[in-house]
Design a protein with these regions (language model features):
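RecA-like helicase/translocase P-loop NTPase motor core
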Residues: 2-467
C-alpha cells in the first residue's frame, strides 16, 4: 500500500475510535480496499477479536481459581446464561472492595477464550478504564446527553455498531446506579429493534449491570430526594425482571487491618441508614471524636504536611492524600490554600469566555452578561476561568480526551512541565499509570449551566486536584 494511504488510514482509525470520520472534517479518505487488506469487514468486531488474540493462554483459569464463593456463584449464573443463550439480565450489587471488577475480568477472559463477543462499558471514563476494552456507555451506545423517557440511542440498524450489538454475547455495564434509568431503557429499546426481538429484554442479549446504590446516585440539578430516587434504575420497569446477585465480602480487608475494617463497617452503616442519631433527620450522621479535627488548617497540615519535601516525594504520596468535600466552593477555597504550600512559582492561565446565541433563543438578558460574570461561574463540569498551577501539583482531567490512552474524565495526573499552550502531565491513576501525556488548551461548550445560552472558554480541561 502507498505510504500516504497508510497515513490516511491511520488517522481514519483514530477518528473511528472517537465516533467520527474523515468526512466530518473534509479530509481525504483511503482510496484502497483496506477491508480486503486486513481481511475485516467491521472494525468494531475486529477489535473484539483482537482482544481475544491478545489474551494470554490459560489466564482465565488463573482468575477463576481466585474467585471466592460469592463471586463463583455469580460467575456460574452469568456463564450459564451466555452459553445457553438465555438472555438473562443481571444486576451485580456490592459495596466497594467486594471484587466486582475482578469478577468482570474473570467473565471477560473466560468468554474471550471461548470466542465470545462482549462489550464492556461504564458510566464514566475512569470506571471504564478498569474494564477490558472498556469505554463509556454514552460513547459506545450513542446515548443522548439530554436523556428523556422516550429517548432512543442514535444507532442505525445498518451501521457497524448495530452489527456488533447483534452478534454480542454479553454486555457488562458498570457503575450504572450513577446514571439515569432512562439510559438503560433507551438502550433496551434500541437492542430490541436491532435484534428484532421486541419481546425480550435487550433483544435477548445477556446483560450484567453492576454498581453500588450506597454511592453516588443520578445527578438531578436542583432535584428533590424523591426526584433523585425516581431517576434510579431500581425505579425502572426493567428492575423487576433482573436477576439480583450480591457480593458482601470486602477483599481489601482480608489482611487484618482492624482500623480499616472498623471504618469500612461504619461507612457501610451510613449507606444502610444505621448511623443516624436518634431524634435527627436522615441527612445527619454521627462522627466519632477520633475522626474530627480542630480547624481547617489542622486538617490541611494532617493530610498535606510534607509539601515542602515535594521533590523527594513519590507518586504514592498523592495516592494516600485526599480531602473530600461535597461542595465546589469548599474545594476552591481549600485548593487555593494548599497550592500556596507547594514550592515553586505560581502560573495562572485565563480562559476566554463568551456567550453563544442559540437558534430560537431570544433573550435580552444574554446581552447583559458581562465577561466578569461568566468568569465567576463555578461548575463541577468546567474548569475555572483562572487556573492556577505549579509544577508538581496534582490535577484532574474533566473530559474524555483519549480514553484508550488513559486520559479521560476523572483521571488524576501530576503537572511535570508548564508551557504557555501545552502542559506535560504524568498519569497518576487509570490504566496507563506512569505514562506522560501532553494536554493542549481546548474550547468547551457546557450544556448544563443555569443560563439560557452556552459559552465556550478555551483553556486546559482539568481542575486542580488537591481534593
Amino acid at each position: 500500500m502507498d505510504p500516504g494511504q497508510l497515513w490516511i488510514q491511520f488517522y481514519a482509525q483514530i477518528f473511528l475510535e472517537t465516533g467520527s470520520n474523515m468526512q466530518d472534517v473534509n479530509m481525504p479518505t483511503c482510496q484502497q480496499n483496506w477491508d480486503q487488506i486486513n481481511q475485516e469487514q467491521n472494525h468494531l468486531i475486529w477489535e473484539q477479536y483482537a482482544l481475544q488474540d491478545a489474551q494470554p493462554e490459560g489466564f482465565e483459569d488463573q482468575l477463576q481459581q481466585q474467585l471466592n464463593n460469592e463471586q463463583l456463584a455469580a460467575f456460574n449464573q452469568v456463564l450459564a446464561s451466555v452459553q445457553n443463550d438465555l438472555g438473562v439480565t443481571f444486576f451485580l450489587d456490592g459495596p466497594a472492595g467486594t471484587g466486582k471488577t475482578f469478577l468482570y475480568w474473570t467473565l471477560c477472559t473466560t468468554l474471550c477464550a471461548q470466542g465470545k463477543i462482549l462489550i464492556c462499558v461504564a458510566s464514566s471514563g475512569l470506571a471504564a478504564l478498569l474494564l477490558p476494552g472498556g469505554k463509556t456507555s454514552h460513547s459506545v451506545f450513542k446515548i443522548p446527553i439530554e436523556i428523556k423517557e422516550d429517548s432512543t440511542c442514535n444507532i442505525s440498524k445498518r451501521s457497524e455498531l448495530a452489527a456488533l450489538i447483534a452478534c454480542t454475547d454479553l454486555i457488562i455495564w458498570d457503575e450504572v446506579p450513577m446514571q439515569h434509568r432512562f439510559c438503560a431503557e433507551a438502550f433496551n429499546c434500541t437492542c430490541k429493534d436491532i435484534a428484532n426481538h421486541p419481546d425480550k429484554p435487550f433483544g435477548g442479549i445477556t446483560v450484567v449491570f453492576g454498581g453500588d446504590f450506597h454511592q453516588t446516585l443520578p445527578v438531578i440539578p436542583k432535584g428533590t430526594p424523591e426526584q433523585i430516587v425516581a431517576a434510579c434504575l431500581k425505579e425502572s420497569p426493567l428492575w423487576a425482571g433482573m436477576e439480583k446477585m450480591r457480593l458482601t465480602h470486602n477483599m481489601h480487608l482480608q489482611h487484618g487491618d482492624a482500623e480499616m475494617a472498623e471504618f469500612a463497617t461504619w461507612l457501610l452503616g451510613i449507606g444502610e441508614g444505621l448511623q443516624i442519631p436518634q431524634g435527627t433527620t436522615s441527612s445527619e450522621t454521627a462522627f466519632k471524636q477520633s475522626m474530627l479535627v480542630e480547624s481547617r488548617d489542622s486538617l490541611i497540615n494532617k493530610i498535606y504536611g510534607n509539601l515542602d519535601q515535594l521533590p523527594q516525594l513519590n507518586d504514592e504520596y498523592f495516592h494516600s492524600c485526599t480531602i473530600l468535600t461535597p461542595w465546589n466552593d469548599d474545594v476552591l477555597i481549600l485548593n487555593k490554600i494548599i497550592l500556596r504550600k507547594f514550592p515553586g512559582e505560581m502560573q495562572i492561565f485565563h480562559s476566554a469566555d463568551k456567550v453563544i446565541y442559540e437558534a430560537g433563543v431570544d433573550d435580552e438578558r444574554l446581552g447583559t452578561l458581562s465577561t466578569e460574570y461568566l468568569n465567576s461561574l463555578n461548575s463541577g463540569s468546567i474548569p475555572l476561568s483562572d487556573l492556577e498551577l505549579k509544577e508538581g501539583c496534582p490535577v484532574m482531567i474533566l473530559c474524555n480526551l483519549a480514553c484508550s490512552q488513559g486520559v479521560c474524565n476523572g483521571t488524576c495526573d501530576i503537572v511535570t512541565c508548564i508551557g504557555s499552550h501545552v502542559l506535560e502531565l504524568w498519569l497518576l491513576t487509570g490504566s496507563e499509570v506512569g505514562n506522560t501525556v501532553f494536554i493542549p488548551r481546548i474550547s468547551l461548550t457546557p450544556q448544563r449551566l443555569s443560563l439560557a445560552s452556552n459559552f465556550p472558554g478555551p483553556n486546559f480541561q482539568f481542575k486542580l486536584h488537591l481534593l
